[in-house]
Amino acid sequence: MIVFTRRITEADTVTGTLTLAVDSRIKSRLRVTLDDGREAGLMLERGHLLRGGELLADADGRQVVRVLAAPEAVSTVRCADPHLLARAAYHLGNRHVPLQIEPGLLRYQHDHVLDDMVRGLGLNVDAERAPFEPESGAYQSAPHGHGHDHPFVRLPAHS
């Protein structure tokens, strides 16, 4: 079985594709079937969402696959009014909903209760099948910096 262990940024040859829904693209350890039917495994660094278009390689770099975001059941909100779109993003984010944000568009995994809430804000919602590429903040668990250092200071225990 092929085991993909690392992300790469470019490859001379891509030997296959791997189409996954977002619920699988958040996992770092996973048994998968490539689009050509070959069995494979993912043993990747934890805490990173796989994006459509990313390349994965096995240990020696002979096998390289391109990840594709599978079409899945999503709710899509399209709106030319940035204020209305921002209000919807605020309310969805307040519910910790993984959210894809693009100019004039919000997308989340289909949920009729959330659809009703967004419609209540005055927006139209389309239920459709489309690739879902949420903001990584909902899944990112790796440490991150802010461009400056913070020394660790132990606070005194409460008495």
UniProtKB/Swiss-Prot annotation:
The keyword Chaperone applies. It is found in: Cytoplasm. InterPro entries: UreE, UreE_C_dom, UreE_N, UreE_N_sf. GO terms for molecular function: nickel cation binding; unfolded protein binding. GO terms for biological process: protein folding; protein-containing complex assembly; urea metabolic process. One of its GO terms (cellular component) is cytoplasm. It holds the Pfam family UreE_C. Keywords: Chaperone, Cytoplasm, Nickel, Nickel insertion. It comes from the Bacteria. The keyword Transport does not apply. Belongs to the UreE family. Involved in urease metallocenter assembly. Binds nickel. Probably functions as a nickel donor during metallocenter assembly. NCBIfam families: PRK13261.1-1. This is Urease accessory protein UreE. The gene is ureE.
